[in-house]
Amino acid sequence: VPADKRIIVGITGASGVIYGVRCLQMLREIEGVETHAVISPAAFLTAQTEIDMTSQELRALPDVLHSFRDIGASIASGSFRTEGMLVAPCSVKTLSGIANCYADQLLVRAADVCLKERRRLVLMLRETPLHAGHIALMSTVTQAGAIIMPPVPAFYSRPASLDEMVSHTVGRALDLFDIDTGAVKRWKDAQAD
């Protein structure tokens, strides 16, 4: 049975690898969603450092894992239909590659395809503080059609744990693809508590 939706998840080596991991975990629980992932070599190191996840465990999360260097992969072509791509976390290096159309590896190429095909591209940029160069890159990709969504937690939901905070933030990112994970405590619901 073909999936109703395909979504690409890119995971870079920036701090915050849990966002990409949680995204793949959440999407695995939703029927009809097929995940395609491209993971940078640095992301495997970050996963080991930040969340004690082995490369084997990380590789097992998506439905389809594409090689970081495979520019000929299905997701490198506009004819391969997807809902779009979430890059979580997104490093400044990756942001720069996307902003400058410098697609020397699959993660940036897949993002570039989303932009040229006018598909959703959400970048969870993990950098702070920002200088003018970072802001210029964010402006460039936004003008090209991307959405910059830094993983800023919502406190109105009164998260009881870091896990809840991460799930809520990833749920908000997936809202942008019209995928409801059930993890987002909506504003009016939070006010009722």
Summary of predicted features, one role per range:
Residues 1-122, 126-193:
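A cross-family phosphate/adenosyl-ligand binding-site feature
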